[in-house]
């Protein structure tokens, strides 16, 4: 009767177990398939099946049924794989089953049982998501408890390194494990165990190896590669330790990678081995390898006795063939310098920091990297005036310069570095042939004057002629004409080398003679050598310098030749020419007439007729006040009246009544003004003279003055003054 009322999920689970007490049982295949279909149909079925498996496992453990426990673990592994979307429903029950199984001393000595538990754990780790790991505290505790029990069993009871590496590999497959502080330490633990076993099976990674050779390799690009990659080497080595290391370090999870690198540093401090470090670095994705260098930098501590080891390991990594991209060179340089200055009392630490800075510049991560590093060191030199700090920074500066094998700096940067570098000739060999500015060349000659060694002066001047050629020639000519026109070794050295550069034997002989007599070249002496363009291709530029009052000639003037025949005339501002009295008088009259337009009243035709008949116009009639800008008003009015009478007689134009006449507008008056400036052609002055005597206008404000000349208008204006 008991079997009649057994729940269906229990029946399906029980049917998967074979009969008998043999330890090597396997679940029945057909019944297992139906059970998987059953648990996939509804979510509630999973809860019932997982709870029943926990209950049955407890009974099997109590009765030492190893075969049934093996069947239970295999069923659990199949359910995890089949129902991974609902893993959070039953995962804690399955972890409980595995913890109880491995905690039972009657079962944890059986390798098969432990392997079956590891298979279930591996399946769980592969399908876990970050939400479950970070939100469920109970699951986190059970996960950690199982790892502790499992590692204890395989190391203390079974002594099985393969199972240990499998467990470490399973931990590395758990996604987003680093985000949970409760279980993130398991990553560090797994890396340490894996590295220890890996070094045991690989002899070349055993023992200390910290030799740093900073002079064997030349400066090269950061993406060089000369040996097997990590993936290729892993295939050659084989085994679970290599697979586990690949899983821990060949990841794009930066949190997980940082934890793994810190575990690596802890192991390397125990047994420093640069080959192991380079192998692990090649395992990391190339775009994330800069994290390895950053973690090493963060691990530095001036109170830590392992600082020298860390710096040496970092140095070996930077000079190795490991490709690193995305490294912030200046940030790393600043951190190392700050640590170095803070540990200035320790010679070993400061020397190790100098080697690391030198190694940092042995690979080119971007174009202007050496210039930026040197500029940063120069800035630190200005910020730290103490002698001890200066000595340390100068040592760093010289170490960086030794890593550069080709010209890269400007002349201006050379002048800033020269006071801190003893071998200035070697330093000048790193200067490019890019033309500097005239001010920089002037500073260069001032620097040469300050040098105490004549041989050094001569050699640097030779190199300057070799790099800048005619620019050095003309810049030196400017300098010695303006500031250095005194007898000195550099003065005669310049003229001697200028003569050799121009291939003038006479110039060279004069330079030797004046050196002996302690005389200087005058401008006239030098003009002789720059006066013939046929012999001296730089004659025109040199002559401009010699005859110029201002010797400050621009770089463009020294490097470019103006077109032939072009005359360089200086722009001299001319003083303004004062106007003549006649121009001034015309200007005043014109201005007054224009201003008086607004005050004038327009004349009427009746006013003009009255004036023509000799009738005096009363002051109250608002008589005309015409313009005086060019000629007299009398002449103007006479011309208008005569024009009106002639046109009326010839064409018979109707003369409107006085009350219908519209006064002249100001625009009409302005047109009449424009007519006054035209030369008289059609009319003679005699016609005006007869009417002038009859005109007697009283002006209201302006002082009347008759015109000194007569005016005539062209026929082009006839009859058009009143047409509007």
Swiss-Prot record:
<dbReference type="GO" id="GO:0005886">
    <property type="term" value="C:plasma membrane"/>
</dbReference>
<dbReference type="InterPro" id="IPR016024">
    <property type="entry name" value="ARM-type_fold"/>
</dbReference>
<dbReference type="InterPro" id="IPR039786">
    <property type="entry name" value="EFR3"/>
</dbReference>
<dbReference type="InterPro" id="IPR049150">
    <property type="entry name" value="EFR3_HEAT-like_rpt"/>
</dbReference>
<protein>
    <recommendedName>
        <fullName>Protein EFR3</fullName>
    </recommendedName>
</protein>
<dbReference type="Pfam" id="PF21072">
    <property type="entry name" value="EFR3"/>
</dbReference>
<dbReference type="GO" id="GO:0072659">
    <property type="term" value="P:protein localization to plasma membrane"/>
</dbReference>
<comment type="similarity">
    <text>Belongs to the EFR3 family.</text>
</comment>
């Amino acid at each position: 009767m008991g079997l009649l009322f057994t729940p269906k999920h229990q029946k399906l689970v029980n049917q998967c177990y074979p009969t008998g007490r043999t330890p090597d049982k396997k679940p029945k295949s057909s019944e297992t398939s139906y059970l998987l279909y059953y648990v996939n149909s509804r979510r509630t079925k999973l809860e019932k099946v997982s709870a029943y498996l926990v209950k049955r496992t407890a009974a099997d453990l109590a009765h030492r049924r190893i075969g049934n426990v093996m069947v239970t673990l295999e069923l659990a592994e199949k359910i995890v794989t089949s129902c991974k979307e609902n893993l959070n429903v039953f995962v804690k029950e399955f972890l409980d089953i595995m913890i109880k199984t491995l905690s039972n001393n009657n079962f944890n000595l059986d390798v098969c049982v432990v392997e079956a538990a590891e298979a279930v754990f591996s399946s769980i780790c592969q399908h876990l998501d970050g939400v479950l790991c970070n939100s469920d505290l109970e699951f986190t505790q059970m996960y950690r408890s199982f790892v502790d029990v499992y590692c204890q069993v395989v190391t203390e009871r079974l002594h099985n390194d393969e199972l240990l590496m499998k467990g470490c590999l399973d931990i590395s497959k758990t996604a987003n494990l680093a985000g949970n502080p409760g279980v993130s330490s398991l990553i560090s633990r797994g890396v340490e165990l894996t590295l220890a076993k890996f070094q045991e099976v690989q002899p070349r990674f055993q023992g200390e190896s910290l030799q740093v050779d900073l002079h064997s390799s030349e400066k090269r690009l950061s993406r060089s590669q000369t040996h097997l990659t990590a993936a290729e080497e892993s295939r050659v080595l084989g085994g679970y330790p290599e697979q586990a290391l690949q899983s821990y370090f060949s990841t794009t999870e930066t949190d997980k990678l940082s934890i793994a690198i810190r575990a690596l540093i802890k192991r390397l401090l125990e047994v420093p081995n640069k080959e192991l470090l380079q192998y692990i670095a090649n395992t990391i994705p190339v775009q994330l390898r800069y994290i390895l260098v950053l973690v090493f930098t963060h691990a530095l501590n001036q109170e830590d006795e392992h600082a020298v080891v860390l710096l040496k390991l970092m140095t070996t990594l930077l000079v190795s063939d490991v490709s690193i991209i995305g490294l912030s060179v200046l940030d790393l340089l600043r951190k190392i310098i700050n640590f170095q200055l803070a540990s200035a009392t320790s010679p070993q630490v400061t020397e190790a920091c100098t080697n690391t800075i030198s190694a940092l510049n042995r690979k080119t991560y971007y174009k202007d990297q050496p210039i930026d590093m040197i500029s940063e060191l120069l800035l630190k030199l200005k910020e730290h005036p103490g002698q001890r700090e200066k000595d340390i920074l100068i040592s760093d500066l010289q170490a960086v310069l030794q890593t550069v094998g080709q010209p890269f700096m400007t002349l201006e940067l050379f002048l800033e570095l020269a006071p801190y570098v003893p071998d200035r000739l070697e330093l000048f060999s790193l200067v490019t042939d890019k033309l500097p500015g005239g001010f920089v060349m002037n500073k260069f000659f001032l620097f040469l004057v300050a040098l105490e060694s004549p041989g050094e002066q001569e050699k640097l001047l030779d190199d300057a002629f070799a790099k800048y050629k005619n620019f050095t020639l003309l810049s030196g000519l400017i300098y010695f004409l303006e500031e250095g026109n005194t007898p000195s070794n550099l003065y005669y050295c310049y003229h001697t080398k200028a003569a050799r550069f121009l291939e003038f034997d006479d110039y060279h002989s004069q330079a030797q003679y004046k050196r002996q007599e302690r005389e200087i070249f005058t401008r006239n002496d030098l003009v002789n050598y720059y006066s013939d363009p046929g012999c001296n291709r730089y004659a025109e530029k040199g002559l401009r310098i010699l005859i110029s009052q201002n010797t400050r000639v621009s770089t463009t003037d020294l490097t470019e030749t103006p077109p032939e025949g072009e005359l360089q005339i200086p722009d001299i501002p001319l003083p303004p020419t004062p106007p003549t009295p006649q121009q001034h008088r015309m200007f005043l009259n014109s201005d007054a007439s224009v201003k008086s337009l607004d005050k004038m009243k327009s004349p009427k035709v009746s006013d003009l007729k009255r004036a023509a008949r000799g009738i005096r116009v009363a002051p109250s009639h608002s008589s005309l006040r015409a313009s005086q800008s060019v000629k007299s008003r009398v002449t103007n009015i006479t011309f208008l009246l005569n024009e009106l009478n002639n046109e009326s007689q010839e064409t018979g134009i109707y003369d409107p009544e006085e009350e219908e006449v519209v006064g002249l507008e100001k625009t009409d008056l302005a047109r009449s003004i424009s007519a006054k400036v035209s030369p008289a052609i059609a009319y003679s002055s005699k016609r005006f003279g007869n009417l002038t005597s009859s005109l007697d206008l009283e002006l209201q404000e302006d002082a009347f003055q008759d015109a000194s000349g007569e005016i005539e208008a062209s026929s082009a204006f006839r009859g058009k003054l009143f047409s509007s």
